[in-house]
Amino acid sequence: MIQLQKATKVLKPLKGFLYGPTASGKTYSSLKIANGFVQAIRGCTEEEAYQHIVLIDTEYGRGSLYAGIGEYNYVECVAPYETEKLVNIINDINDMDNIDVIVIDSLTHFWSKKGGILEQKTIADSKGGNSYTNWNVYTSKFNAMIDAILESPKHVLITARAKSDTVMVENDKGKMAPKTFGLKADLRDGFEFECDFTFNVDKATHTLFVEKNIPGMDLIYDPATPDLGKLIYTLATENAKERVRTVPEVANSIRTISKENAMIPYVQLSLSGRPLESLSIEEILKLEKDLINEVKKKQIKR
């Protein structure tokens, strides 16, 4: 029989999504929001906060152009944009105690650009493979990347380019003028629902329109500032409690990791015949951490 418990607000790493047309201000907005997160976490100045942010740049080095706003950390990821590359980068950053926020700019490249999921699937189809089977294979790869983002202990802000359209609209002077709208993210449908909050960034004004919010947020922010980051962090963490993992939960995690990575013998050797559930929470958490480190070493050797 299931056990019911009272719903409680739990502390968790925040995942935010910003999408919009090229030059709408996604990168700048993400860095400002990330800065607010860090200020709220560490109680530091705006200048100091950038030291605890890392930007993963897929935009051909454009992410470094914002260096004038602060000394954030920077990693460039180049084509081919295989999902495994991003997973490895995130896993490395997860172990860095000085980093609080990861900005991924942008996730679109791992979906529709050179070496991304769509191109890999097209190549597999051209070699005579079954299209349905190929989708299963590459959907699994994409899902593994999304899982790495969502399961990261860091706060993560993700950007994506938007498929856009330009239409004639009446401006504030009563004249017709072209306006570019970001219609939908150039990414697998539904990704925005995986995140805690989503902004559609307007190209002309850099205004952030809220499409998914944390309770208490307004519908429009113009422009993005560190204060917006502080607000989001405060709304998400106010009266929240630290989540406590249970022994059975960690045991299931260990079983899954060891099975997926052919590490069952390692776990059995570490247990010396003891059942997983007989370990204390401290012992089983250490085993999980050691197992993850061994998996990373194994992947590097490949």
Regions found by a protein language model. Give the residues of each.
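Post-Walker A helix-loop "phosphate-sensing" segment adjacent to the P-loop in P-loop NTPases
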Residues: 35-53
